[in-house]
């Protein structure tokens, strides 16, 4: 008589049979490792990404995304017609950076600190000093960061935006992340 035990589920279902979101698990693991750096328990929703993308300036082509995470905004940008070679994603977390590179091989994904945005954009050859980028889309948890970090990031953002470019940021909190 065989005593086969059921195998542990490591795929797409939990013990209760509900779907497991691999991106949500990856994101949550990173949050457990460094909650202050992640600033959120789970990735942004597709609905939020859609609302953010609707704020892009008309005809936007060169886009920088800060805090690419699991790629929710990245996918929305690509779905909205942004060419992969016109998208630069900056992600500080090494594991999420690797995930983004695998998921979006045609997109320029950089493992770097948003505080160094100007150097990242210039160093990557993504745009030149005169033209700037059309928009910066950010999912960073700005309100969980020290003021000096916020200032450094915002300085970099406004240094790389073209005249008339747009900074698109969301936050969960009682105050604007940009003041």
Regions inferred by a protein language model and the residue ranges of each:
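Conserved class I S-adenosyl-L-methionine
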Residues: 60-69
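A short SAM/SAH-binding and catalytic strip from SAM-dependent methyltransferases
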Residues: 133-148
